[in-house]
Amino acid sequence: MAHASEALIGFAHPRESLEKGRVALLKAIEADERLSIGHSGLGWVQLWTGELDAACESFREALRLNPSAPFALHGEADCLMLDGHMDESITRLRELAAVSPFWAVHNLPLPVHLYMIGRLDEAIIAVQDVHERVPHFKMHWVLAWVYWQQGRFDKALEEERLQLKRHGDTVLLAALEDGLAAGGPYGAMRAMAEALVARANESYVDPFDIGATYARAGMVDEALHWLDEATRHGSYELIYLAFWPHLDPVRNDPRYQDLLQRVYGERAQEIMRISGAR
């Protein structure tokens, strides 16, 4: 998982890191196939590279070896969501939070999945529960997504401000305020997206983040351009491409359908149907 983590924070290319991770994990499994973490890690590599059936089999094997394996619980929840079993997916994530209640990485999936399947009020409650349990881990960005989807733009932008202030990101904060003054909430998103593009010329920015921000601004062409770049790049968030509510503005565009085909392969039509019913 260390190789994947390097890519998550911009120190390496996702595709290269995942292949290095795959080699290391296969060696670990060969050395001791009874260790569940090896199968969990391999499952995540397979999921992020679009090998959905193989990933879900790896997660099941990890859980057979250790029914409380946290990374495998998260992975199986993703598999259940991709198969259309939303309630079962959420149940798995509640198990995950119970197994690892104080580790931030295992408390993030529940509110995010609730957001992805449109259970927005529950997502807010889940975030609040995490804030009480893990006070140092503030999910302002998740609340910003949820409030935006609810049309509560003032609250969404306030959560964006809190997130940016927490990270000391004065550039994006200034872009938000300037864009808001010039063009309202959608202007704020546009200005933030443009600031991310400018930043990408100097340092690492996940192209998925740029595309998602343009989508929230309602700028379909720009959003799809950067989502296409994210597909070439191998951005990890693409595994949820069919489900992110903030991508709704691009959902009916044929170019988005093409991206889904590239991400999900032969399961694209099935997953499109499932995500449309959320």
Feature roles, as predicted:
Residues 30, 34, 64:
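Short alpha-helical segment in the cytosolic histidine-kinase catalytic core
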Residues 5-9, 14-16, 23-26, 35-42, ...:
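Alpha-helical protein-protein interaction modules
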